[in-house]
Swiss-Prot record:
SUPFAM superfamilies assigned to the protein according to its UniProt record, in alphabetical order: L domain-like
Cellular localization per UniProt: Nucleus
Disordered as annotated region, ranges: 228-253
GO biological process terms held by the UniProt record: mRNA splicing, via spliceosome
Protein name as catalogued: U2 small nuclear ribonucleoprotein A'
Keyword Repeat in annotation: yes
Keywords: Leucine-rich repeat, mRNA processing, mRNA splicing, Nucleus, Repeat, Spliceosome
Protein's organism: Aspergillus fumigatus (strain ATCC MYA-4609 / CBS 101355 / FGSC A1100 / Af293)
């Protein structure tokens, strides 16, 4: 069922036990977040038990601080999510499809995010999962309902360094993302934010991209490579075309 204006208007909006105004959108098999501009002045939105695959496409909601999305299909988070819901403090993503540690990167810009739940996602089985989230999203104080300890923060820093000088392990993890990238923001009017463009890489191009990320000398260089991929562009040094032209020249000689 689409998240239509009519569905939002007919859904229950109430003051919950925490004295927050909450919009109940549970259990409608909603595939895409859309039309939320009509749902003004909400403190919390409950999307539990739907079919949402991408977390994004929110209007500017400075008041929203709690999102409940357990038992959906979320596998992608819009990189610009922090610009639309900047005051989010609690995000529950239990039983979704987040797969890679680097797929969580957009959450690092939610500087008020203190409570994060990722239980029953494939990403939780990754090595160093908890330390990575603690390092990459330092605002988080409770991860999967467990308080983040100072010793864990120290261990995370030991493993991954700092944002300015990440370790080789951190750089490697930042380069491994699911093969789905955001459509450029310029196309937002033509396509919902949850739709994505897949960058089709040959095996050689994929290996070159991974090598470029491993050999990157700064976080800024890694960010540039990520941006090119997010925009649907293959980084210049990874293109097969140059190699093909060399092969053609050799054949002609």
């Amino acid at each position: 069922m689409r998240l239509t204006v009519e569905l939002i208007q007919n859904s229950l909006s109430y003051i919950n036990p925490l004295k927050d105004r909450e919009l109940d959108l549970r259990g409608h098999k909603i595939p895409t977040i859309e039309n939320l501009g009509i749902a003004k002045d909400q403190d919390a939105i409950d999307f539990t038990d739907n079919d949402i695959s991408s977390l994004g496409n929110f209007p500017f909601f400075p008041r929203l601080h709690t999102l409940l999305l357990a038992r959906n299909r979320v596998k992608h988070i819009q990189p610009t999510i922090a610009s639309t819901i900047p005051n989010l403090t609690t995000l529950v993503l239990t039983a979704n499809n987040m797969a890679e540690l680097a797929d969580l990167d957009p959450l690092r810009n939610l500087t008020r995010l203190t409570h994060l739940v990722l239980l029953e996602n494939p990403v939780t089985r990754k090595e160093h999962y908890r330390y990575w989230v603690i390092w990459r999203i330092p605002s988080v104080r409770f991860l999967d309902y467990q308080k983040v300890k100072d010793a864990e923060r120290a261990k995370a820093k030991e493993l991954f360094g700092t944002a300015e000088e990440p370790t080789a392990l951190a750089s490697k993890i930042m380069g491994i993302k699911s093969r789905t990238f955001d459509v450029p923001s310029g196309g937002a009017e033509r396509a919902p934010a949850d739709k994505a463009v897949r960058v089709k890489l040959t095996e050689k191009e994929r290996k070159r991209v991974e090598k470029m990320i491993r050999e990157a000398r700064s976080l800024q260089e890694i960010t540039r490579l990520e941006k090119e991929l997010n925009e649907g562009r293959i980084p210049g040094g990874a293109l097969d075309a140059g190699e093909d032209s060399e092969d053609e020249n050799q054949m002609q000689t």
